[in-house]
Structures are given as C-alpha cells and as structure tokens.
Amino acid sequence: MQGSVTEFLKPRLVDIEQVSSTHAKVTLEPLERGFGHTLGNALRRILLSSMPGCAVTEVEIDGVLHEYSTKEGVQEDILEILLNLKGLAVRVQGKDEVILTLNKSGIGPVTAADITHDGDVEIVKPQHVICHLTDENAAISMRIKVQRGRGYVPASARIHSEEDERPIGRLLVDACYSPVERIAYNVEAARVEQRTDLDKLVIEMETNGTIDPEEAIRRAATILAEQLEAFVDLRDVRQPEVKEEKPEFDPILLRPVDDLELTVRSANCLKAEAIHYIGDLVQRTEVELLKTPNLGKKSLTEIKDVLASRGLSLGMRLENWPPASIADE
C-alpha cells in the first residue's frame, strides 16, 4: 500500500542472524534513501564509544614495582602481562568495583580460570591466557581491580588525580569498558513495490561475550532514542492550517483473519485464541503464537509469509487498538 510521497517509510523487517554467541548480523529494512548511513553510523559510534561494561583498571603483582620490569620465571614481561589483562572479559552483577586475586605456581600457562572471585563475578572466557610460568619453582600472585564504566579511559587520564595516594607497585591499566570488539555496517539496495531507491542496513558485530549482540544493538538504539527525546517536542511547533484526516488504522488491519486465506488448522488455532482481526494478529509475537495449542512452527511460518506478502509482520505495536468500530461489535 503506497502512502503519500511526503511520508517516511518505517522499517518493517528486523532480522537477526546469530553467527555465534558473540557474533551476529542484524538486517534492518526498508529505509528511506540515505537513512541506512544515517542510522548505521550513529549506532556504530554508540556501540564503540558509549556502551557500559567492566574492565581491568589496576593491577598489583607481588615483587613488581613498575610496568617496565620483568619477573623471574615468567615468560612475558610486565607490559605484556598488563596487555593480556586488558583482554579479560568480566561480567559483574550489582557492583561497580571488585577485587580479583590470582595465585599460580609451577610450569604452565596462567589463564583467567586461575582467578579467584565471588559469586557476583563471571569470567566469560576462562581460557584467556595471562602469562606463562617457565620454571617449577616459579610463582605469580596478583590483585586485579575491575570497575564498571563506559567507553575508553586511558591510564594517563587517571594518573594525575591518583598520584598522591597511589602506592608504589600499583599499576594502572588503560580501561576499555565497551563490550563491543568489532562493529561494521553496510548499506545495500532494497525494494518495496515499485520503489527501488531504498536502503537496507546490515550491521555485523562481535562482542567479548559479556553481552549478547542482540542486547547490545537494543541498548545502543535506546541510548540514541533517549538523546533525541529533547528534540521531539519541537516537531509540534508548526501545525499545518489544514490537515487531511486519515483513517486511524490501515484498512487491512480491520479485516478479519479469514481474509488471509490461511489453512484450516492455522485459522482455527487463531480463532481459539480470540484473534478475529488482522490487527489482533500482528500484535502477537512469535513466542506468543507458539504457545497456542496445536499451532506449530509450520503454521507460524505460513502466518509470517502471508503477513509479509501484505507488508505486515508479527510484533507490531498499534496504539488505541481496537478501534471503536470493532470494540462495539
């Protein structure tokens, strides 16, 4: 259904392809021409610079006074150990700061699994290597401070504020709080009916495992929306003198589900759930429909395909539904 030339298309499809637990592709379409880059660049910047997370900020290693030194029996120098600790993926519940301890002796690798912590802390990648001990008599003991923050804060930004109270041997670490390790977006061509000048936004991202990629996208979009809220009221400053009245709902939403010509099984399942109009159906989610007795994935796929052919989808939000014309029936 083609709207006015002055109206903006709203994305009707959000597809999330979970490549792995830390890697996902998110596709958003259709978008007006140019909006692919507008939204893609904004989300990319937020995901890289503004996502909250936890990171190592300070380390104390027994027998080490400064970062430009080495430790007997340890293969890596202290700078390399600090670099490895920066890659530690930690999830902390209910606290802004925790102290972790690590004690290891004997030949072999020292990994994140050797860190001692309480129940509020989860080491996401326990196989992450911190250093290697090269002697049977070698040992390493350290205390690791993990803090919650946002973005990237270099150690140099904290040196001057903490210089007076920082004891010798406490090593500051550049803190990269963002759980997003890689983010890239691509804008492809999309088509709706006769329009071929539309955008499709494809975002590919990887996280460190402390946050699900889908949740990261959701948080970034929320941050962007909250920042733009200050401008929302400005849109009502100018009101057109004459405004053509439009129907409150798309007429297709007011039609009965029988018009979708679903199979008898699918139609009966919907009626059993008191889903009589297409407007009732599009507000349901996939999860809700799968809970319907006798409605399986095959029927769900059929419903999604039929809705998509009409430019609709599940999970839509309809304000003031049902309309008075239906509610009175």
From Swiss-Prot:
GO cellular component terms given for this protein: cytoplasm; DNA-directed RNA polymerase complex
Region feature (Alpha N-terminal domain (alpha-NTD)): 1-235
Annotated spans, Alpha C-terminal domain (alpha-CTD): 249-329
Any one Gene Ontology BP term: DNA-templated transcription
Family in the record: Belongs to the RNA polymerase alpha chain family.
Chain's role: DNA-dependent RNA polymerase catalyzes the transcription of DNA into RNA using the four ribonucleoside triphosphates as substrates.
Protein name: DNA-directed RNA polymerase subunit alpha
